[in-house]
């Protein structure tokens, strides 16, 4: 197989996998479809938790896991193409009597087998989308501001190396709905993806120039506009916390 033939074969193999393609089989299209579906599942989970429909929550849990599996398969397909391209560029003579498709298939099988052998915690416990899914349900079911537990709680993980990779997603036991800048209840929250602290939107944006240190005492995270995002679930949680506070004061 000549170098030109090899290059042509690789391009054909990656046509429907690599980012940038516009057809419905492209990597970008499929990944976007999965991400959009995951967002819808999380929104449905909020409603299901609110009306205490546990059967629906179980179905949504299974659904989001299937979507995350599908997303991982896509990413591993892309990784397989990248690995194949690297291998061929290193030593083209190794591919004289081998089919690129067979080699690609073998690489993909090894990667997918490694993924499938992981525990449920290993597959989902540190995935941002699954953590958000569990957070959404937890905060709707625990409006008193209880700590969001370690993700290993949802998988019955005990003293394994996987615990070391657990996401740190703990909120204060006393849920403080006041902005660290205005010291007033937050009405329009914006969340820092750098440290998970949140603030009144206008207050923190006025502090950026173009960056600033997180105003929460003891936090040294440096903020910039691209690290701040609006979060409708957080806004809902803050609103519920304020409603509970008003009832207690009445």
From Swiss-Prot:
GO terms for cellular component: cytosol; nucleus; Smc5-Smc6 complex. It is an enzyme of class 2 (transferase). InterPro entries: Nse2(Mms21), Znf_MIZ, Znf_RING/FYVE/PHD. Pfam families: zf-Nse (PF11789). It comes from the Eukaryota. GO terms for molecular function: SUMO ligase activity; zinc ion binding. Pathway: Protein modification; protein sumoylation. Autosumoylated. A zinc finger (SP-RING-type) spans 164-243. Zn(2+) binds at residues 195, 197, 214, 219. Its main location: nucleus. Acts as an E3 ligase mediating SUMO/Smt3 attachment to other proteins. Acts in a DNA repair pathway for removal of UV-induced DNA damage that is distinct from classical nucleotide excision repair and in repair of ionizing radiation damage. Functions in homologous recombination repair of DNA double strand breaks and in recovery of stalled replication forks. Plays a critical role in meiosis. Belongs to the NSE2 family. This is E3 SUMO-protein ligase nse2. It comes from Schizosaccharomyces pombe (strain 972 / ATCC 24843).
């Amino acid at each position: 197989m000549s170098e030109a033939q090899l290059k042509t074969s690789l391009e054909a193999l990656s046509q429907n996998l690599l980012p940038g393609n516009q057809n419905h089989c492209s990597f970008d299209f499929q990944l976007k479809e999965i991400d959009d579906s995951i967002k819808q599942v999380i929104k449905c989970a909020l409603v299901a938790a609110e009306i205490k429909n546990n059967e629906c929550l179980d179905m949504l849990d299974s659904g989001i896991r299937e979507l995350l599996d599908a997303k991982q398969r896509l990413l591993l397909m892309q990784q397989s193409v990248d690995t194949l391209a690297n291998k061929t560029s290193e030593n083209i003579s190794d591919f004289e009597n081998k089919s690129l498709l067979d080699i690609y298939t073998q690489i993909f099988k090894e990667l997918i087998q490694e993924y499938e052998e992981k525990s449920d915690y290993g597959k989902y416990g540190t995935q941002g989308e699954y953590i958000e899914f569990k957070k959404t349900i937890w905060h709707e079911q625990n409006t008193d501001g209880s700590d969001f537990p370690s993700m290993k709680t949802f998988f019955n993980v005990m003293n394994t190396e996987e615990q070391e990779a657990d996401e740190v997603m703990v909120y204060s036991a006393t849920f403080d709905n006041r902005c660290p800048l205005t010291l007033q209840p937050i009405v329009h929250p914006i969340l820092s993806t750098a440290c998970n602290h949140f603030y009144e939107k206008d207050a923190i944006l006025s502090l950026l120039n173009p960056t600033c240190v997180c105003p929460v005492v003891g936090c040294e995270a440096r903020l910039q506009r691209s690290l701040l995002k609006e979060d409708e679930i957080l806004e809902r949680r803050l609103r519920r916390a304020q409603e509970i506070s008003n009832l207690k004061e009445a």
